[in-house]
Amino acid sequence: MADPYGDGKGLKQQQRQKLKPALEVEDFINLLHGSDPVRVELTRLENELQYKEKELGEAQAEIKALRLSERAREKAVEDLTEELTKVDGKLKLTESLLESKNLEAKKINDEKKAALAAQFAAEATLRRVHAAQKDDDMPPIEAILAPLEAELKLARHEIAKLQDDNRALDRLTKSKEAALLEAERTVQIALAKASLVDDLQNKNQELMKQIEICQEENKILDRMHRQKVAEVEKLTQTVRELEEAVLAGGAAANAVRDYQRKVQEMNEERKTLDRELARAKVSANRVAVVVANEWKDGNDKVMPVKQWLEERRILQGEMQQLRDKLAIAERAARSEAQLKDKFQLRLKVLEEGLRMSTTRTNVSAARRQSIGGADSLSKTNGFLSKRPSFQMRSSVSTTTTTLVNHAKGASKSFDGGCRSLDRYKGHVNGSGMNVSTDSSEDKESNNSDEKANEFTSVETEDTVSGLLYDTLQKEVIALRKACHEKDQSLKDKDDAVEMLAKKVDTLTKAMESEGKKRRMEVAAMEKEMAALRLEKEQDNKAKRFGSSSSQLPPGRTLPRSGSARNM
């Protein structure tokens, strides 16, 4: 019988030849992308396929050995059946001989009994003859006994022959009984061998089922391998397309990098402008303090230098506190910026820029209001000399309130400046209250000339001239204009940064959408490859099962039926 699995080596060679281009494609993919999960899955499936092929080869070898042993056992069973048929024929012959010999023995016994009866009858006749001879004259006894003795001798001779025949028949019966016992033993051995053959046939059927299962698994693995090969080909195509897309998107990436570099440069410029703005604010605050504490007319010098110096010292202390807080906030922002991602940091910087732009607009509006108040003061400077001292002091209170409003607008641009403003308000309000009380005291002292002379003599000590006020006011106006221009430039730059950030966001979203599409396509390809592998494995299993069933021996079950009939 031909081996149905004799072409296993040819199939392995064909599979290896098919795997070579797939391995080259996998090496190319690994060169492009490093470790590939598809290649890992392919290697795992190839290892499983090799393991299953080894198991299939072992199962085929076991099947061949079992088939050879089954053939030998079938031959032994056939020989035993032939021997059993011969022994059965011999038994039948011996039984027929025994029956014939038994019949002959019965006949001999009957003849023996008849001879004994004849002997007894002859003896009785002899007795009668002797009795009759005594009475009457009879023929001689010897003449009568001679034929009878001859017959007796013949009968004894026949009896001896029959006894010899009976002994020979007994020996034959004993030998036949021994042969029957041996035949029964051989029949029992044949039955045991037949049961072993049945067990082996059952095992062979189980092994055939396992072989079919292994063949189905091999078909499934072949299908999966084909699907993986198709997936690899599709992935190579997608890799090529992605490379083309990457090459096409190189210009976009370069543009994004240019935008990022421009954003960094603009952030640096914004930081420098923030520093200059802080310096300008400090100088503007100083100028505002000087302007609030100085008057134009040299004859009507009101505010003493000591009070101005104290207010200046307080404001400088508050500004130093604000600077310290600003430095701490900048350090915290830097430490947080190092931990956060680039895009989040840029977005937060843009948001802070927008917030700063709104606060700057508020500050510029407050400064314009303060500039308008200063202009009105400069216009009404000629009338201030004619007013009395209590009106001048009330104007001092109004200038202090405008200074407080200006300090409010300046402190809102910094973090943590509310507490210093409250303290400054309290201090200024205290000074205003003092001024108002002084004005009320002046109203009361207008009646007496001596008190007015003493008051003017005390307040004219250590005062500042009004000419410095005009120069400081001009410098403040120029600084405000420069700050306004810087604010406008910062707003323009912030708008440009926002536009760049929006473009970066759109580009990142487009890249993410493309990546999601690629992932979905790869998942669909993997599903299709799995389905193709399953179909391939099922086809291979069906083909192998059909080839194995077609190559099986047709008269394989005939010895079983013959042995069963003999049993």
Curated annotation (Swiss-Prot):
Subcellular localization: Cytoplasm, Cytoskeleton
Tell me the InterPro entries matching this sequence.
Answer: MAP70 (IPR009768)
Region annotated Disordered, chain positions? 425-457, 534-567
Question: Major location, coarse class?
Answer: cytoplasm
Coiled coil found in the keyword field: yes
The family note in this entry says: Belongs to the MAP70 family.
Protein name listed in UniProt = Microtubule-associated protein 70-1
Q: What is the lineage of its organism?
A: Eukaryota, Viridiplantae, Streptophyta, Embryophyta, Tracheophyta
Q: Which gene encodes it?
A: MAP70.1
